[in-house]
Amino acid sequence: MKRVFIEKLDEWSKKSNRKPLVLSGARQVGKTWLLKEFGRLHYAQTAYVNFDRNEPLKALFKGSFDITRILTGLQAESGVRISAKDTLIIFDEIQQCGDALTALKYWCEDYPEYHIACAGSLIGLALQEGTGYPVGKTHSMTLYPMSFGEFLCAIGEEALLDVVQSGDAALVNAFAEKLKPLLKTYYLVGGMPAAVQAYATTLSLASAREVQEDILSDYNRDFAKHAPKIQVPRIRAIWKSLPVQLAKEDKRFIAGDVPTESGGKSRSRDLKDPFEWLEDAGLAYRVWNVTKPAIPLEGYRGRIFKLFGLDVGLLAAQSHLSPRAVMEGNRLFTEFKGALTEQYVQQELRASAGAVPHFWTSSDSRTEIDFLVEGADQVVPIEAKAEENLQAKSLKAYRERFNPRFAVRTAMTGLRVDDGLVNLPLFALPSFARVIQTDREDCRA
């Protein structure tokens, strides 16, 4: 497996004002593997400890934040002689020990020379429970499922990723017929590392689906294990509703479409806490509308949102989508009103471009832009479609009204730039970060 996130970890490790790192993300996105692999590649040794069901380790942080004393205990627990210069210290499942989270303040203030990297799947939930998180004393990052580019590397197609990232339209278009079926495969396999590994090893979509179903079962058990009892039925109802909501023509989330335990309709205020729980667990993301497409987008956040899942492959599994039935032609890209395509696009925007997408709808609801992201100094509108014959009427209306320097339309047609409109093939989304760094005159995917 190759995760480009390792490059971000390398940047963190070299900072002169480095703070302890807290890496969050949903369960099973590969946080532990990533930190261990980073330690293997960039440090002489790694001291790894896991707080899950480890009472002696938790006791080490009780009652005293004497870092010298804690270091002695960490060496005994990990079996590694820790050196500030060349040892990566990994605290796994740190949300299981609130005192260890609090202690990060003292590592930051008094022992900044040590390289501390923490991983936790439910850190957001731990904070809800009143853990003394050291605000301003850590560096936070979020790990998402493997992107399409990382998937290409995992199945031995790294050369095709180089093509996609070249920015050469003629070169990218020349390999379109090789990239399209691989993108179809990614829609079904997704980016959960275990599912990717299963497919890369067997080339079997069925093997990947078995892994996905196990992951979904694990998440369902997590609801009962970690969520407040009163919220569990509502969390499960939202989770079950997610594929149905995305399969609608209008993908805005409607609370009334989520059934209550008694079979009635849910109310928005009753779902507020369950939504936050799913987001804190990294299992779902709300993409909010904005009342005005201007920077900062979050400053113009409205009250309407679309709810997306963690991973396109998991969404396909939740939807019980038969791989055999949809691999022919381009049906997969448009199935369920393009639900998988929009899931893929927003997922890629987060994972590859580090963007936080929003969307915009005109006051008369006639024009909707699927996604807006912040570029270097402008809001970039994105129309996320899969059809090959696109009119992009909403994008045209948006451009006429707001005159952005450039806009992006995803499609299955070739890569090209025409008067500030970037036609970006869905399989070229791994290069999107380059798009938002440029002006329309020299815009290159």
Language model features with spans:
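Structural recognition of the conserved hydrophobic beta-strand(s) that form the central parallel beta-sheet
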Residues: 90, 115-121, 142
